[in-house]
Each structure stands twice: as structure tokens, then as C-alpha cells.
Design a protein with these regions (language model features):
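P-loop NTPase motor core of the ASCE superfamily
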Residues: 134-136, 486, 494, 570-628, ...
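Short, flexible loop/turn elements at secondary-structure junctions
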Residues: 57-59, 95-97, 149-153, 392-394, ...
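The start of beta-strands in P-loop NTPase/AAA+ ATPase cores
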Residues: 143-147, 521, 706, 742
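Glycine- and acidic
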Residues: 56-64, 383-392, 492-498, 510, ...
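P-loop NTPase motor domains
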Residues: 69-84, 328, 426-481, 527-529, ...
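Conserved P-loop NTPase motor cores
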Residues: 348, 478-483, 487-502, 507-514, ...
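The Walker A/P-loop phosphate-binding site
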Residues: 18-48, 281-282, 461-497, 507, ...
Length: 880
């Protein structure tokens, strides 16, 4: 039979969680060109008002040289000494294996992608990121800083009891008159103005000028979202229920709900409190507190990285660190130290009388003396509370993760799990609680540390990411995502360096996929293998019809084909067409002059070519033929009549240029016939040669594809290869000028930079291309070839604001150190950057304007399958 359930006679008493948090309202302050948010807190009627502001902080980069570490350490130590008294600041470093933000961005890209093939590649990237997050290899880390401003209550403003009594009587009379509401509003406005002027601005200047940390103030929406996501991670934040707005017009209030904010914060999930853990939103949370610091650190770098080295481990995930500090009273600390010295001295004497040695007493005495010395030398004491929150899905996992963190700290450093008041400390980590961290009604468990010790106990280290979107790399130290965004308004050029089989092409293909998804056209200059295949053969075929792969030995590319500028404004079109004519003149100059041509002749030839280009594009008949050909399109009869190099050659005579040169100053007329003769001779050669016929005939390729790959194959002479490269550059420039943004990828060849004119054109793209929206990517095995191009090569290298260095040969290490100025201990690590077959990733050193970051690139498996170009890999792919 079914057993009967007995009656339960027990009674339980519950307390509303709203009573344990002190949020009164969200605040928005919009003064002096700033838009900041704050939490307005008040624990009870007798306690003062308090505002909590927030910063998003970049922190200190995890990869710094020894000199940079010393500078940063001294800045932090010096800045701590200027912290406002009676206030507290909380550093909150969170490390969660989450990919929600990245998945949302990629999902938006997938939706906007122009073809199913590109969507497929992006879905492969989404799958890889999901895999990395689930295994703990991808762990974004965020550093937020919360600081307080406390406005004293009316009772605390008066020291004498009679003044306090008069103040209470005044408030009572105001209440009787019915003006208490207006008085309360005026007082709130006074509090908010004082908090902004005497609180926020002070903290802002402290971070910017003293600590020299990059910060971004959080507005009311970001603060509300941050608080909501901690308590309700799986639901979308609701509108702020009650909001106070202070601007130049005064104080206003917006009410979107009659239910108080604290009640709505816990509407979706109410935390369940236990002595050892807190259960909220499907996760168990344990609390670990810091009981003692290590005996010391080897150097400043080890001290700064003390907590980072713990949280950056692969085993540590879904963990938060809170460090709250507030200035202590130096006199009280000094008195305490003196008492400890006296106690230690007494204990030592007692031990001597027993003919014994009290080691602990001697150690305490020595440390107390050192602490007093530091205080007299200017060190500032701080009350410090450090807490770790560990989140797991089950209690067994929680116990194991908590033990791991405890074991990572070696004595005398001591971190222990809370087994009695975990719920209370968890509440204290919320920015809407006025209680200090690790303070209780019956005890104050905060420790006192000096300002010279705190840099090792504040979680300030993070991995710097140049951008928030684009190509994603993973930081070698800590698994933090590092993004490179080439699609912002600020142009960036990239240099990718690495030996054969280092993964350059795979990495670049990831950038190209993101470009195609954003409808950004790409032009690539490729040097295929003898069989005609290369990395981008299969890639361009895969993304077809967006991509087209053209073998310049079999196709015709009209050097004089005009760029399509119809989508631009009149001013932009005119400016870009002038740039195109300059570039075309440079191409013609490279075709006419040789390496040994005298400089004075070269100058005259350059002048003649530019004048004739202007005359050519001003001719009405030429313009009409262009119009008809562009209107009819590729392959039409009118297209076959489009102006080419042959037509330009007709303008190369003394009659045509005599009038043009009248306006040119500094022209040596004795050299004009000789220069003109050389121009006609060389251009006639190009018109009749095999390569020349390909560039002086109407184009046979569609130049408006999103991806154009030009393959320089079956070119035996260096001069032919150079000119074909120039023609490809011209086609790339035409494509780029037709769009507001484009990418030009160059797979560097030693032949390319042997010709100064070609190197000069590449340098022009790197120097001025960003203005036209062109992002240049150059891939090479080493920088020697570019560096050997003299000033032009140096100009190219200097404009590569981003550099990725993969695996390099040991013999090339010295050249990287010499050309780029890399410290040997950093660049030498690239010698060991072998592709990891088990983890399917490659290693890269990212150089972003002198900021070094060791990273990994985890390509999507689909992306890797498309661009893999080893013979055995190509054979396997061909089977499918």
C-alpha cells in the first residue's frame, strides 16, 4: 500500500532578500559632456547616502617587458597613495567560458552573408568557438572597477548635540509645513552634484593621471545590465524601473514600474543560501577568502602577475576575483605594529630565560619593524578584502574546483573556502550592498596591507585586445579572445610573417571570409606552384560565384580600364580618379625605365607620362569609347573597342605634348626628344610582346567580383613578372576605388621589390591607401626583401601597423630583431611556433604598435579543409 505522508508541524521563518541589499534607485548624471551611471544606496535612515560608480578598465597588459613592468608598478604604487579617505574601491575580474557575444556577432554576419558558401564557413567558425568555450580554452576576462562616494548624514555633519537637535527640529517643522518632498528632492540634487564633483571627477583623474589606466565610465544602462546579468544570466535585462536623472536642467525622475528595483532584480530567480554555497540561476557558487599573503615575490613582474597566474590556468574557469580596498588610519596601524614589537620582544626575552628560541616572535618583530619603516618612508596602509567566487553546475564539481584554487596558493599564502557565511560574503560582492567586503557585525576580517604590497593583490592584469570584432585569436596566456578588426573606419595594414607551413594562408583566409561576409571586396595577388595550384585556388572556387581565380598568363587585363566610381559622391569620385591616374602613371614609368636609367632622364619621363595620361583621359573620343564599352559590358562589340595601351601610344608624340609642357616648370627641353623616344620604344615593345598583348587588349575577366585572385604563373623573366604584378595592382586599385572599403592581399615575392618603381607603388598604397579605404595585407617569410628596398621598403614596413609573426627559422631571428627592433628574448620564442596537430592551432606573436601578445589561431575545421594546400591534403580533398 502507498505509505501515508505524515503532517509536518515544523515552521520556517524566511527573510526577504530585498532587505539585504541597499539599492534605492539607479542614477544617470549627464553633466560636463559626460554620461555616467551610478547606484544610489542607503542602508537605513540613520546611515549616510552612498553612490557607487563604475568603470570598465583595460587593466595592465599581461605581456610587458621588464622596463615596462617597472614603470607600471611604480605608477600603481604611487597612485594608491592618493586614494580618497573614507571611501572604498572594488576591483572585479571575471573569467567565464562564455561565447554569447561572439556567437551573436557571427550570427548577424551569417544572416548578412551574400552566399551560402560564406555562411557555411562562418557556421564552421561558430562551431569551433563553441567547442573552445566548452573545453575552457576560450575564456573572456573582464575587469570592472566600482568606487564609492559617501555623503554624510545630517547627524554626522554636526559635532555638537545641540546642533543635531536643532537639525532634527528643523526637519520636523519642514514636515509639518508639507515641504518635506521638495526638501528631499533638493537634498538629492545636492547629493548627486556633490558626488559628481567631489567623487566621480576625483576618481577619474586618479585613474587617468596617477594610475594611468585606460578606463571607460559605465552609464546607467551598462550598470543595470551588469547587475542583472549576475543575478539573471539567462534572461534579457528589463527596463530600469526607477531612474534619477541629473543634468543641467536639474533633477528628474523616470518611473517605468511601481515595483521596486530590488524586487524585480530577483523576480526570475531567488538565490538559495547555504552555509557553504549559494545557488542562483542554475549554478552553485562557493566563496573563498584570502587569509594571508605570500612571504614575498621574486620581482615586480611576479608580484603584478600573482593573481593573474592563478586565474590564467586552463583548469581555472568560471571564476571571479573581488578585491576591495579602503585607506586605513596610519596612526592606528603604527600603534598596532608597536604593540606587536613589544609582544615579540617580551616573548623573545621569555624564551631566552628558558634558554629557548622563539622563531615566530623574531619573525613577527622583524616584519613589524619593516612595516613601520615603510610607513615612515611614505607607504600607505589599506584595509583589504579579497574574495574568490567559483561557479559550477553541481556540488561535486564545485568542491573539486574550490580545492584546486586552495591548492594553487602555497604557504604562507593562504586561501580558504568559507563554510559558514558564504551567502553573506556573496551578498557583499554585489555593488548594491553598502557593507564592506569581509566585515561583519561580530568581526572585521579584512587584512591590512601596505601600498607597496597591493599591486600583487589587486587583479589588474588582463590581455589587451586591439578590437572587439573581426578575426579572433586566443591569448596564449589565459585564453582571452584577441580581435583584429580591419573593417572599421580607421585603416589598418597587416604584415603576416612566417616560414613555409607556418599557417599564413590559413590565417589570411579567415580575414578574407569575414571581408566577404561584410561585402568588402578583396583582391589577392598570388604566386602559385608550378602546377598552377595554390592556397586560394580551391578557396576562390569554393566561394564562387563571389570568387574568381585568374591566371594572368591565359587572360587579358586591360591596363587602361577605368574604375567604376558611380557609387561614390562627385567629390570622392574625382579624388579617387586622380589617385588612379597617379597610379597608372607609375605603372607606365615602371614599364618604360629600367634599373640603370639616369635619374634626370627618369624625372623627364615621369613628367611626360603624367601629362600624356591627363591628355588621354581628357580626349572626347576616348571618353565616348569608354562610355559605350562600360555601358555594353564585358564581351560586347563595344567592349572590344575600349581604349587600351595601343591608343595611349598614339598620344606619345611631340605634337601632342608640346602644348602640355608649356605649363610645366623645370622641364629640360633638350631631354624631351630622348625621353619621348624611350617611351615610344618601350611601349611599342610591350604592345607587341606576349605579356604586353595581355595587358594592351580588352579585359577578358569580370572585374566586379567580390574576390579577385590574380595568379602570376609561367612568367620566366623578372621584368615580365614585375609588369604583370603592376597590372594586377592596377586591377586591384580599380576594384578598391569602386568601393568605400576593400582589402588588397599581396603574397610577397622576391621579384616584386627588386624594382624600385613597384616598391614605390606598394609604399603608396600602404601610406595613402587607408584614406581610400584600402587595407593592405602582405604575407612573407621574412622582412629582408622589403627592408632591402631602401627608404621605400622602410616606409612599407613602418605602415604595417599590425604584424603577426608565426614560426620563423632560427637564422631569421636576427633579422627580425634588427629590422623591427624586437627584443631577442621575445622574437626567439617564435622559433618554437610549430603548428599543433592535436589542438589544431597555430601560434602567433601579435605586434600592435609595440604591444606584444602571444596568441593562437584556431581555424574552423571547414576553413582549414578549404585552404589546405599540401599535396597529400589536396589529394584527400579531391576525393570529396
Amino acid at each position: 500500500m502507498k505509505p501515508k505522508i505524515p503532517k509536518i508541524n515544523q515552521s520556517f521563518q524566511f527573510a526577504a532578500i530585498e532587505n539585504f541589499v541597499h539599492l534605492q534607485s539607479m542614477v544617470s548624471i549627464r553633466l560636463r559632456n559626460r554620461h555616467i551611471g551610478a547606484y544610489l544606496l542607503k542602508q537605513s535612515k540613520s546611515t549616510p547616502w552612498q553612490l557607487v560608480f563604475g568603470f570598465a578598465c583595460e587593466g595592465i597588459h599581461s605581456f610587458l617587458s621588464a622596463q615596462e613592468v617597472d614603470e607600471v608598478f611604480d605608477q600603481v604604487e604611487s597612485g594608491l597613495k592618493d586614494f580618497p579617505a573614507n571611501e572604498s574601491i572594488t576591483f572585479h575580474l571575471s573569467a567565464f567560458c562564455a561565447d554569447k557575444d561572439r556567437q551573436i556577432r557571427l550570427a548577424n554576419l551569417v544572416e548578412a552573408a551574400p552566399s551560402d558558401e560564406v555562411k557555411f564557413l562562418l557556421m564552421g567558425e561558430r562551431q569551433r568557438i563553441q567547442e573552445l568555450a566548452s573545453t575552457g580554452l576560450r575564456e573572456p576576462k573582464n575587469l570592472k572597477v566600482y568606487f564609492t562616494y559617501t555623503f554624510g548624514s545630517s547627524e554626522r555633519e554636526y559635532a555638537d548635540w545641540t546642533e543635531r537637535a536643532l537639525s532634527k527640529m528643523e526637519n520636523f517643522l519642514i514636515y509639518l509645513k508639507g515641504d518635506s518632498g521638495a526638501n528631499q528632492g533638493a537634498k538629492l540634487e545636492q547629493i548627486l552634484k556633490s558626488a559628481f564633483n567631489n567623487g566621480y571627477l576625483v576618481w577619474e583623474q586618479l585613474f587617468l593621471n596617477k594610475l594611468k589606466l585606460k578606463i571607460s565610465p559605465l552609464n546607467e544602462f551598462e550598470l543595470w545590465q551588469s547587475l542583472w546579468s549576475r543575478l539573471n544570466p539567462y534572461s534579457k535585462a528589463i527596463e530600469i524601473p526607477q531612474l534619477l536623472i541629473l543634468n543641467e536642467y536639474g533633477l528628474q525622475e523616470e518611473i517605468h514600474s511601481q515595483v521596486h528595483s530590488t524586487t524585480l532584480l530577483f523576480a526570475d530567480s531567488t538565490p538559495i543560501a547555504d552555509r557553504k554555497w549559494v545557488y542562483n540561476a542554475g549554478k552553485y557558487t562557493s566563496v573563498l577568502s584570502f587569509w594571508d599573503k605570500p612571504a614575498g615575490w621574486k620581482d615586480k613582474q611576479q608580484q603584478l602577475h600573482y593573481l593573474w597566474d592563478i586565474v590564467a590556468r586552463d583548469l581555472i574557469r568560471d571564476t571571479e576575483i573581488f578585491c576591495q580596498i579602503s585607506p586605513a588610519n596610519p596612526a592606528l596601524v603604527r600603534t598596532t605594529m608597536q604593540r606587536l614589537i613589544k609582544q615579540s620582544t617580551t616573548a623573545t626575552k621569555a624564551a631566552d630565560e628558558r634558554q629557548d628560541v622563539d622563531v615566530a616572535a623574531k619573525i613577527n618583530a622583524r616584519r613589524s619593524v619593516e612595516a613601520q619603516e615603510s610607513l615612515y618612508e611614505g607607504a600607505v596602509p589599506f584595509h583589504t578584502g579579497i574574495v574568490f567566487l567559483v561557479h559550477r553546475s553541481s556540488l561535486d564539481e564545485l568542491d573539486e574546483a574550490s580545492r584546486q584554487i586552495e591548492n594553487f596558493f602555497l604557504r604562507p599564502a593562504w586561501v580558504a573556502r568559507e563554510t559558514e557565511v558564504a551567502w553573506q560574503i556573496w551578498l557583499q560582492t554585489l555593488p548594491i550592498v553598502t557593507e564592506k567586503l569581509l566585515t561583519f557585525g561580530y568581526a572585521n576580517r579584512r587584512l591590512v596591507y601596505l601600498s607597496k604590497e597591493l599591486p600583487g593583490l589587486i587583479p589588474l592584469i588582463t590581455t589587451f585586445s586591439p578590437d572587439t570584432d573581426g578575426l579572433e585569436l586566443i591569448g596564449e596566456d589565459g585564453g582571452t579572445p584577441v580581435h583584429l578588426d580591419f573593417f572599421k573606419s580607421e585603416g589598418k595594414h597587416l604584415g603576416v610573417f612566417g616560414t613555409t607551413r607556418s599557417g599564413k594562408s590559413v590565417l589570411v583566409s579567415g580575414i578574407l571570409t569575414h571581408a566577404l561576409a561584410r561585402n568588402v571586396p578583396v583582391v589577392a595577388l598570388d604566386y602559385p606552384k608550378p602546377d598552377g595550384t595554390s592556397t586560394f585556388t580551391d578557396y576562390s572556387n569554393f566561394v564562387s560565384p563571389l570568387g574568381q581565380y585568374f591566371d594572368v598568363s591565359a587572360e587579358a587585363i586591360n591596363l587602361f580600364e577605368r574604375p567604376t566610381l558611380s557609387s561614390l559622391t562627385v567629390e570622392e569620385a574625382a579624388m579617387r580618379f586622380e589617385d588612379y591616374k597617379d597610379f597608372l602613371s607609375g605603372c607606365l614609368l615602371a614599364m618604360v625605365v629600367g634599373i640603370g636609367t639616369e635619374e634626370i632622364i627618369k624625372t623627364t619621363i615621369r613628367t611626360l607620362l603624367y601629362c600624356m595620361v591627363n591628355n588621354f583621359f581628357a580626349n572626347p573620343d576616348i571618353l565616348e569609347r569608354y562610355r559605350l564599352a562600360e555601358l555594353a559590358g564585358l564581351g560586347s562589340p563595344s567592349w572590344q573597342d575600349i581604349p587600351t595601351l595601343k591608343d595611349y601610344l598614339k598620344f606619345c608624340n611631340l605634337t601632342e605634348i608640346s602644348n602640355l609642357l608649356q605649363l610645366e616648370e623645370g622641364v629640360d627641353w633638350h631631354l624631351v626628344p630622348k625621353a619621348l623616344e624611350q617611351i615610344r620604344l618601350r611601349l611599342t615593345y610591350w604592345v607587341n610582346s606576349r605579356v604586353g598583348r595581355a595587358i594592351s587588349s580588352p579585359s577578358t575577366v569580370q572585374s566586379d567580383s567580390m574576390l579577385l585572385v590574380f595568379a602570376l604563373r609561367q612568367v620566366s623573366q623578372s621584368e615580365d613578372a614585375a609588369i604583370l604584378s603592376l597590372v594586377a595592382y592596377a586591377a586591384a586599385l580599380r576594384r578598391a576605388m569602386a568601393s568605400r572599403m576593400s582589402i588588397f592581399f599581396i603574397d610577397e615575392s622576391p621579384i616584386l621589390f627588386q624594382f624600385p618603381e613597384i616598391a614605390q607603388l606598394v609604399a603608396m598604397l600602404c601610406a595613402n591607401g587607408a584614406k581610400a579605404g584600402i587595407r593592405v595585407i602582405i604575407a612573407a617569410q621574412d622582412p629582408n626583401t622589403m627592408a632591402s628596398a631602401g627608404k621605400v621598403g622602410a616606409q612599407i614596413l613602418q605602415n604595417l601597423s599590425l604584424r603577426l609573426i608565426g614560426r620563423i627559422q632560427r637564422t631569421a631571428t636576427a633579422s627580425f630583431a634588427q629590422i623591427f627592433g624586437y627584443p631577442y628574448e621575445i622574437i626567439s620564442q617564435c622559433e618554437r611556433f610549430l603548428p599543433n596537430k592535436q589542438g589544431v592551432f597555430t601560434q602567433w606573436l601579435l605586434d600592435d604598435a609595440g604591444i606584444y601578445t602571444f596568441t593562437r589561431y584556431y581555424p574552423a575545421y571547414i576553413q582549414l579543409a578549404v585552404v589546405a594546400n599540401n599535396p597529400d591534403e589536396q589529394a584527400i580533398r579531391a576525393e570529396y
